[in-house]
Amino acid sequence: MRLCITGGGTGGHLMIAEALVEACANDGHEAIFIGSTSGQDRKYFEQNSKFSHVYFLQTTGVVNQRGLGKLKALWLVLRAFFASRAILKKHNIQATYSVGGFSAAAASFASLSRLIPLFIHEQNAVYGKLNSILKPFATRFISAYDEASPIKGYPVKDIFFKNARLRDEIKCVIFLGGSQGAKAINDLALSVALELEARGVKIIHQAGERDYERVKSAYEELGVKAELCGFTKEMPSLMARADLAVSRSGASTLWELCANALPSFFIPFPHAASDHQYHNAKFIVDNELGWCQREEEDLRATLLSILPQNLADKSKALMEYSSRDVAKKMITDVVMSLNA
């Protein structure tokens, strides 16, 4: 099979694309990538050897633009649309998988115009604008939050499943402020640090590179020994050591925590598009798999109320809920659809 994978802009979308191309390579399928010169697409895939070819077309997001900016963005998408048509023809592409984001627009519409089956993965509980437009025309629409989705789950690296373990008593809490930092989560960690130390609970804290020095100084003033980092590539092993996570609820991190069977207290980023982080976390709460609270609420009181709880039921439920090999299932589904 010859597959085009398109989409990106941000890391969450691109991690799904990465999972899909790895599944393609493992099953002996050829994949090309069509992305954008904007965003993080080049950083992720310019040197990726699993794609036979990669293309970065000049596009930008359309939704948040106004006036002349929107017209220019639409013109760039139109130009990239014709370039994508030529690329799809050149490689004799049989199917296209969109992982969403503004980078996906040109190749997705080009695929439909060439009658190439379009498969879509939606990473968030609230559909992105582009995916909402394309969904009626898609051969398959995959979402971990949709009961009607033919494939359940979210593409997560296998290491998070391998490191999964059943949690019960809380002996270690990991605070995930993200690579850029999340002041609300960092401040929450500092506000409970003395209480956690008094209870004998260890602290692992990814504070983000921007806020690292402030948080480091604050722990020193408190006299609390926390395992602190700004950014780390060792997230799977850090998660594995924790019994509770305090985190934002971007889709990739949320489902990695679920795969690890790590019960989590989610504090959504309040300015996410369409408030999707809140709705991602609400899905987990509605399934009784975790906790969620807005930044402006009493985060400290909620976290302290969680600490005495036995987490075995939630951790076990997470193990049973999370699906393994989702990327492989998505690629197998494309092959079966083409052969039907």
From Swiss-Prot:
GO terms for molecular function: UDP-N-acetyl-D-glucosamine:N-acetylmuramoyl-L-alanyl-D-glutamyl-meso-2,6-diaminopimelyl-D-alanyl-D-alanine-diphosphoundecaprenol 4-beta-N-acetylglucosaminlytransferase activity; undecaprenyldiphospho-muramoylpentapeptide beta-N-acetylglucosaminyltransferase activity. One of its GO terms (biological process) is cell wall organization. Pathway: Cell wall biogenesis; peptidoglycan biosynthesis. UDP-N-acetyl-alpha-D-glucosamine binds at T10, G11, G12, N124, S179, Q277. Pfam families: Glyco_tran_28_C, Glyco_transf_28. One of its GO terms (cellular component) is plasma membrane. It catalyses: di-trans,octa-cis-undecaprenyl diphospho-N-acetyl-alpha-D-muramoyl-L-alanyl-D-glutamyl-meso-2,6-diaminopimeloyl-D-alanyl-D-alanine + UDP-N-acetyl-alpha-D-glucosamine = di-trans,octa-cis-undecaprenyl diphospho-[N-acetyl-alpha-D-glucosaminyl-(1->4)]-N-acetyl-alpha-D-muramoyl-L-alanyl-D-glutamyl-meso-2,6-diaminopimeloyl-D-alanyl-D-alanine + UDP + H(+). InterPro entries: GlcNAc_MurG (IPR006009), Glyco_trans_28_C (IPR007235), GlycoTrans_28_N (IPR004276). Its EC number is 2.4.1.227. Cell wall formation. Catalyzes the transfer of a GlcNAc subunit on undecaprenyl-pyrophosphoryl-MurNAc-pentapeptide (lipid intermediate I) to form undecaprenyl-pyrophosphoryl-MurNAc-(pentapeptide)GlcNAc (lipid intermediate II). HAMAP family: MurG. This is UDP-N-acetylglucosamine--N-acetylmuramyl-(pentapeptide) pyrophosphoryl-undecaprenol N-acetylglucosamine transferase. The lineage of its organism: Bacteria, Pseudomonadati, Campylobacterota, Epsilonproteobacteria, Campylobacterales.
